[in-house]
Amino acid sequence: MSDGDKNGRDNHEEALVPVEVWQELERAECLARGAALKWASGVFCRPEHLEKLGQYKKRESQRTASIQSRLKSVVQSYLEGVDWGLGQLREARAELRGVSHDLYKANLESRKNSEEVTTLETLREISVSHCQLLAAVSNLPRLYKVRSMVLETERLVESRRLLEAHARLMELERWQDEVLLQLQGPRGSSGTELNSEDEELVRNYFSGVGRLVDALAKELWAVVGSGLSLAHQNPTPFVSAVRIVEREEALDQFFLEERRSTSGHNIPMPAGRPRNWRDRFFKVMEEAVSARFRSVSYLHTRGPGLASHLSALQHCIMGDLSTVRHCLEQCVPAHYHLTRAYLHFCHQFLQTHLGLVSGWELEGGEIFAVLNWVLHIYNSSEMMGEPALLAELEIENLGPLISQEGLEQLQNKYVQKVRKSVSEWMQKALEVELTDWQRDQEPDIDHEGYYHTSLPTIITQMLEENARVALMISEALRDQTIQMGLYEMEKLLSRFRDAVIEFGKEHRKDPTVNKFYLHYLLACINNCIILKTSTESLQQQICSFVSNRYSRIPLGPLAALDRAVRKACRLVMDHLLFELQPHLQELLSSTWLDQGDVTLNMCGVLERHCELYNRVRQPCRQRLKEECQWLTVVEYVRAVMQKRLVCRSSDEQKQLAQRMTQDAQQLRDHLQSMEIDGTIGEVNPTALIAALADIINLKDPGMLLLEISGLLSKYPDISEEHVSVLLDIRGDVPKEVRKSVLDFLDQSAPPLPPGYRPIFTEILVPSSSIPFCLPTAKCT
């Protein structure tokens, strides 16, 4: 396009938009005029400022000229740049025309030479065929020797000359690969691929090579598998096997690298490659380890032989480990880390084997053997905790032999088995105890002089022994075992209490059958005290480890012990009452009034019982003596009140009061001689008899209200019925006095003080009936 055309086009475009251009000019001019007007109005705001109009005009003219010159300079440089660019475009167009002309000529020459390429392709095929034939001719001597080399290599394998056999095998494989490559053509060429028939022919001809590989591998893995057994005798075959494995591993890496490279991308991998004999080496070692361990007393792992089996495993592992560390480790490269691999194989086998053993129906001793071996022996310095092994491998990375869930299941199984055994032994011990109660001799006496039987010793030793054995495993298992033992003891004590009750029933049916009934009741109380001490000791062992998950302590055994002791003490008091009853019936008789032998006989019974109570351990000994005193006083007062006698004169009142006072003094003296404190809480039971005697012997009936108020202050549980019986016994109380006394009791009902044990609450007063007089000579 010419410059004139361009100028014409530009002019045409300018003619198309004259309005838009002039609008902008007009707008700019208006803005300029407005700015000038604003500026002038600010400068010439006063007439005297017009004098400087010439100066301002000259300055603005100079500024306008400067701006115009700068604009011209910028436009000129822009035009020069445009002119230079146009020149470069013209030169480039000329060069492109030359290149297009050369390409056209080259295309013409290529079309002329296309017929000659076909001739060259034929020549190339002839050349490839010639090379293959030349290779075949050069390989004929090798091909003739293949069969003889195969036979010779087989003999070497059979005689376990493994290194020589492997060298011959490598040579045969190299010949086979070279023949295949030569038949395929030069490397990197794009010629024809190997014919499948030719490849099959070569494979068949070298078929003996594959058999040699299998035979060599069989012998090789046999040597590796027997390495642990033959290491001390002759490690040479094992060393040869490792060297062959490393050679094969190097060949595998070579072929893999060759196929990864660009030049060997199209070359097929030799048959049977990669062999990965190093991985197979460790696999064979693992199988050999498993086979050796399975042969260690495997047939005798059930029953009592399980502990021996685990011990044999320990000795086998440590013996083989010593062989690996001191013999086989020097026969392999350092990067094999054979000791670490052996530990890993052992750990995997033990995980599987112990998982199988844990699934069996094991007895308590067998479970203990497994837990002790897993938690303590395996990680101890006798096995994997040896410092040299810890430096070689961190056992924690292998994981536990038995999972945490599996351990908990085993521990629960152990506790259940021990529970069954404990329950059976406790039942047998209870049966022996019941048999001992029927013996015609008193119970055994310990070195402290207390009655006892074999029951607490058996129970205590059994529970403590189970806790001690469980602690050898873990504190948690010890706590579980203790809790189980305490629960079983609670069941035993419930049966024990039932047996004591039945023992008492049989004695009440025929008291003459068992002469030592009381003695064995006292022995039962001592047994419970011993069991309580043992129970508290076991509970303290649990309390000393509050953080464990089994921190809940069963309180049932102590409550069961308390119930059993209370029942035995109640039966002891029933037996005392049974022996006192004939003497209590003689109270308020003429013999009692005249001679007083009844009270002496009662004291004799109390002495015999208290002597036996000395065979009881504290605090039950003191409790029995206090109950003995309490029972005697209560029964004495009950006998006085239930017979409802009436004194017909002051002499009779005096006689009755004197006898009661003498009885109270005799009881007090005998009780003190038997080291029984007369005070229970703040009340002296024997003082009650003397207090009742004082009320009966009171001369002035008008003073009864004062005496009754004093009696009420000491014995606040006395009722109107009891006081009414006392007034009836006097026989001389006016109705007004009786009414005032009973009204006073009705209005004064003091609360029972803390620690006060009611007496009159246990004494039931019979309904009113015809009273009888004192047994005087006239009445008789």
UniProtKB/Swiss-Prot annotation:
<dbReference type="GO" id="GO:0006887">
    <property type="term" value="P:exocytosis"/>
</dbReference>
<keyword id="KW-0968">Cytoplasmic vesicle</keyword>
<dbReference type="GO" id="GO:0000145">
    <property type="term" value="C:exocyst"/>
</dbReference>
<protein>
    <recommendedName>
        <fullName>Exocyst complex component 3-like protein</fullName>
    </recommendedName>
</protein>
<comment type="similarity">
    <text>Belongs to the SEC6 family.</text>
</comment>
<dbReference type="GO" id="GO:0051601">
    <property type="term" value="P:exocyst localization"/>
</dbReference>
<dbReference type="GO" id="GO:0000149">
    <property type="term" value="F:SNARE binding"/>
</dbReference>
<dbReference type="InterPro" id="IPR010326">
    <property type="entry name" value="EXOC3/Sec6"/>
</dbReference>
<dbReference type="GO" id="GO:0030133">
    <property type="term" value="C:transport vesicle"/>
</dbReference>
<keyword id="KW-0268">Exocytosis</keyword>
<dbReference type="InterPro" id="IPR042532">
    <property type="entry name" value="EXOC3/Sec6_C"/>
</dbReference>
<dbReference type="Pfam" id="PF06046">
    <property type="entry name" value="Sec6"/>
</dbReference>
<comment type="function">
    <text>As part of the exocyst, may play a role in regulated exocytosis.</text>
</comment>
